[in-house]
Amino acid sequence: MTMITPSFPGNSLAVVLQRRDWENPGVTQLNRLAAHPPFASWRNSEEARTDRPSQQLRSLNGEWRFAWFPAPEAVPESWLECDLPEADTVVVPSNWQMHGYDAPIYTNVTYPITVNPPFVPTENPTGCYSLTFNVDESWLQEGQTRIIFDGVNSAFHLWCNGRWVGYGQDSRLPSEFDLSAFLRAGENRLAVMVLRWSDGSYLEDQDMWRMSGIFRDVSLLHKPTTQISDFHVATRFNDDFSRAVLEAEVQMCGELRDYLRVTVSLWQGETQVASGTAPFGGEIIDERGGYADRVTLRLNVENPKLWSAEIPNLYRAVVELHTADGTLIEAEACDVGFREVRIENGLLLLNGKPLLIRGVNRHEHHPLHGQVMDEQTMVQDILLMKQNNFNAVRCSHYPNHPLWYTLCDRYGLYVVDEANIETHGMVPMNRLTDDPRWLPAMSERVTRMVQRDRNHPSVIIWSLGNESGHGANHDALYRWIKSVDPSRPVQYEGGGADTTATDIICPMYARVDEDQPFPAVPKWSIKKWLSLPGETRPLILCEYAHAMGNSLGGFAKYWQAFRQYPRLQGGFVWDWVDQSLIKYDENGNPWSAYGGDFGDTPNDRQFCMNGLVFADRTPHPALTEAKHQQQFFQFRLSGQTIEVTSEYLFRHSDNELLHWMVALDGKPLASGEVPLDVAPQGKQLIELPELPQPESAGQLWLTVRVVQPNATAWSEAGHISAWQQWRLAENLSVTLPAASHAIPHLTTSEMDFCIELGNKRWQFNRQSGFLSQMWIGDKKQLLTPLRDQFTRAPLDNDIGVSEATRIDPNAWVERWKAAGHYQAEAALLQCTADTLADAVLITTAHAWQHQGKTLFISRKTYRIDGSGQMAITVDVEVASDTPHPARIGLNCQLAQVAERVNWLGLGPQENYPDRLTAACFDRWDLPLSDMYTPYVFPSENGLRCGTRELNYGPHQWRGDFQFNISRYSQQQLMETSHRHLLHAEEGTWLNIDGFHMGIGGDDSWSPSVSAEFQLSAGRYHYQLVWCQK
C-alpha cells in the first residue's frame, strides 16, 4: 500500500466557506487518515512493552490563541497567516462555552437548531484556534508527522503555515492528518476553524449539554516512512479454555520490501509467553490472491490467565516492524486480555459463563470543565463504580476518550462501545437511517469506532447508536460489524429494541411486570419479552432505573427478576453523573446550574441531572441501594445457619471476611468473624453459635457484612462489599412503667386547653384544634402548630414532563394540585378535653377540605400522663375520589436548632419505602446538616423509615414511623429552583409520617410508583409518643 498524497481543494478561507463542507452529509472528512488503534511509534521494543512515554508522541495540549466569531463568514482571511488582535488565550482541551464564549445549551430530544438537514443556521458560532510550535529537525528529514485531534465539536478545517490541510467531523472520534508536506524548519503555525453546528450535528442529538471546541487531546506523532498502519489482536480458545491462540493481523504502508518482517511477542510482566515472526503477505482471499501489505500471526498460549471484570488479567502484545537482520523500524503495542464473548442458548457468555450485567450509563461530564475528561476523573469514576458493585459501563452515547478503554481494561469493567449516532429529535426518528444519503456519515461513525477500539478486551458489545429509529443504514452497519468482528455481539435499541439489527433485546425503561403499549414500538414487560413467540435472545436493559433526583424506587424488583430469569441478564442504570455545571454569583460563589441557567433555548431544565452521583462525584443516597442490590454475595438465614452464595463467575473469595453481629435496638450482644472461602458460583455454610435471648424489650437484629481486609486496585482496606440484615425477634416490655404520683393539670379557657405538669406545658387551640405550643420552663418549643400533612415537595418523578407551558394531568403533582391537596384547609369537627385518673386526654377531628370538598378526615387523641409523655393516636380516612396522597403524617417547626440527630431505625442514608433494602436498622447519630440531601433541584428529601425512636434537642419521639428533619420547609423546597437559593429557616422543620408513598424511578416522565407503594388503603392508623428526655 502506497502513502496517500494529500489533496488540496483550496488554501483560502474564501474557498472553504464557499464549499460549505459542513452542510454536505457526503463529506465527512477531507484528507483524514484511516482509523486505527492508538499509536505511539516506539523505536525501542522495551519501551513499548512497558508502555513508557514515546519520544515520537508529543502533546500539543496547553495554551492556544483563540478568537470567537458569530459565524464562519465573519472570520477574516488574515487569520490564516497571523493571530488576530482580539484573540485571547484558552486552554486546549476545553469547551469554549466554559470560558465565557457563547452559551452551553442543554436539551434532551429537541434539536438546538431548526431541523432542516443537512443545513445549519447562518449564525453558526465559530472558534478560531491557533498555535505556534517547533518540531524536531529530524522529523523534517524523514518519516511522516501526523497531527491527531482526539475530539473536536462539531466540525473543523485545519491549516498549517497558511496552507489548508483538511477537514473533519464526528466530534467523538479522532481526526488525524499528515502534516509532513506542510511543516518547515523553525516555527510552524496551526490554524483550526471550529464550527459549532454542522450536518454532523443532526447525528449528535444526545441528551446532554451541547458544547463546542477542541475538547480532547491534540498531539503530534512521528512515524517512519515505512510503518505499521494498523494492527488487530483477537483471542481464540479450545472448549475448556486451557489453550488459546493470540491472532494478530498487522498491516503496513510505505515501501513494501521483501526484507521487511513483523514480530509479535506476548508478554506477561517481564516474561515472554510467546513470539512469532513472519514476512508480509496475507492469506489467500480469493482467486486473485491475498493482501501483500498484511500478515496474520498466530501465537499458541497454554493455560492463559483469562480476562474478566472480576480478574482483569492482562498481557502485553508488542508488534515490531523490522528488517530481516532484526533492525527495528518501529514498534506498536497494546494490552491483551484473553477472553471470549458469545451468545449461546439465549445467554450472553463470557469465557463460557453467563454474565449478569451490573451496568451504568456514563456521559463524559465535569462540572468545571464541561465535556473535557482528565485521567483523575476517569479513574475516580471507575473506582466508584467498582466500589459500588458495578461491573459494566455503557459509553452513552458516543465513543469515549481513548484512555477510558485502557483504564477499563486494567481495572476491570465491561464496556458497551456506542457509535456517535442519535437522531432523537427527528420526526420520524428513523428519518436519517432510512436515507441512503446519510449512510456514509453513519458508516464512518461505526466503522471508525470499531477500528479504533477493537483491541480492548473490556469492549464486549458494540452499539450502533441510540434513539435513532431503525432503518436500512443501521441494518447495513450491523452486517458490516458482524463481518469484520464476529467476536462481539451488536446491540441497538432503536426501532423497538428487538429488531434484526441487534443480537440482544436491549429496551430502555421497560418495566418488570407492566406493558407499555407505545405506538409502533411497544415496550413489553421484561418478563413478557422473553416469552414472545420465536424470541430466543438475551435481554439486557440498555437504560433502566432513571436516577433523576430523589429516585431509584423499585430498583429491587428488577434485581429479583434478573436473578429469577436467566435470560434477563441485567441492565445499565440511567445514569452515572449529574450533568450540572458550575456558575458563579456576583460574589464569586459557585453554584450548580442546569438547563436554561445560561439563557439557553430550547432547554429541558433539570432533566440533565439523572446521576447516581452529583457532578462532583459525591454519591447520591440511591447509589447505596444500587450497591446493595448488585452485591456479589447473597445470603440466606435458616435457623442459626447462614448460607453465603457467590455470584462471582471467576473469583474465588480470597480477600473477604464475614462479620456478624447480633444487636438489640442497636446495642451489640454478640459478634464474630469468619473467613469466606467460596468458589466462583459456590456456597458456604456458616454456623453461628447459640444466639443470645435478651430479656429486655426491643428488636433483635442479625447483621452480616463482607469486609475486604486488604486493599485492592480499586478499594481501600476495610471496604464493605456486601451486607444483609434479619430481624430475629421483637421482645415486648413486660414490666409496667413506674407509676407517677404527679397528675397533669387541665385549664380551660375560651381559646385554649392548657395542660401543666411540673415545668412543662402544652397548649391546644380550641379554634383550630391543633397543638399550638409547648413549653419547657419558660422556653417555647414550637414555632408552628403540629398539623396533619398529606403532601410533599414534588420529586422529579412526581413532576414527570409537566411544566408551566405543558401540563401533564397524569403527573402525580398535577393530580395532587387539581384535587387541592396542596391548598386543603382544616375544618375543625371536634376538640374536647377530658381529665382521666392519671392523665389528660385531648380529642380532635378535622376535615381537610378544598373548595367545599372533603379530602381527608383526621381524628387524633393526645394523652398526656403524669410522666410527661404525650401519646398521639391518629386515624385518617382518605376520600375515595381523591388521588392517593404523598404522605400521611404530622408536621411542625421546632424552635430548637440542635447540632445532631439521633435515631433508632433504618439508616444511615436517606431511604424511602420502595428504596430501603440497603438501609440497616441500628442506632444512628448524624449532624443535622447530614439529614438533608442537597439535590440541585430542591425536592422532598432526607426521609428515614422504620424508625422506633428519634432524639433531637430535648425531645424524643417513639413509635413506628418515618421522619425527615431539616432547616427547610416544604413550602421553601417547592418554591426554590436551585439548592444554593435555599436559606436556613428559623428553628427546625420536622415531618413525622405514619405512611409515605414510594418515590418511583422506573422512569421520570410517567407515574412509576408501584401499586404496593402507593397509599391506596383508604383508612390509616398510627401512633407515637412524644416526650422530653
Curated annotation (Swiss-Prot):
State the superkingdom. Answer: Bacteria
Question: Key word Aminoacyl-tRNA synthetase present in the record?
Answer: no
Whose protein is this, by species?
A: Escherichia coli
SMART domains, A to Z? Bgal_small_N (SM01038)
Query: Which Gene Ontology terms cover its molecular function?
Result: beta-galactosidase activity; carbohydrate binding; magnesium ion binding
Cofactor(s) required for function per UniProt: Mg(2+); Na(+)
Q: Which UniProt keywords apply?
A: Glycosidase, Hydrolase, Magnesium, Metal-binding, Plasmid, Sodium
**Residues that bind Na(+), according to the entry?**
207, 607, 610
Q: Which family does it belong to?
A: Belongs to the glycosyl hydrolase 2 family.
Task: State where Mg(2+) 1 binds.
Answer: 422, 424, 467
Give residue numbers for the site Transition state stabilizer. Answer: 363, 397
Task: Tell me the active site.
Answer: 467, 543
Alphabetical GO CC annotations of the entry are: beta-galactosidase complex
Record field: catalytic activity: Hydrolysis of terminal non-reducing beta-D-galactose residues in beta-D-galactosides
Gene name of the encoded protein: lacZ
Q: NCBIfam families in the record, alphabetically?
A: PRK09525.1
Describe its partners and assembly state. Answer: Homotetramer.
Q: How is the cofactor bound?
A: Binds 2 magnesium ions per monomer.
What EC numbers are recorded for this enzyme? 3.2.1.23
Top-level EC class as recorded in UniProt: hydrolase
Q: Where is substrate annotated to bind?
A: 108, 207, 467, 543-546, 610, 1005
Q: Which Pfam families match?
A: Bgal_small_N, Glyco_hydro_2, Glyco_hydro_2_C, Glyco_hydro_2_N, LacZ_4
Q: Which GO terms describe its biological process?
A: lactose catabolic process
Q: Where does Mg(2+) 2 bind?
A: 603
Q: What is this protein called?
A: Beta-galactosidase
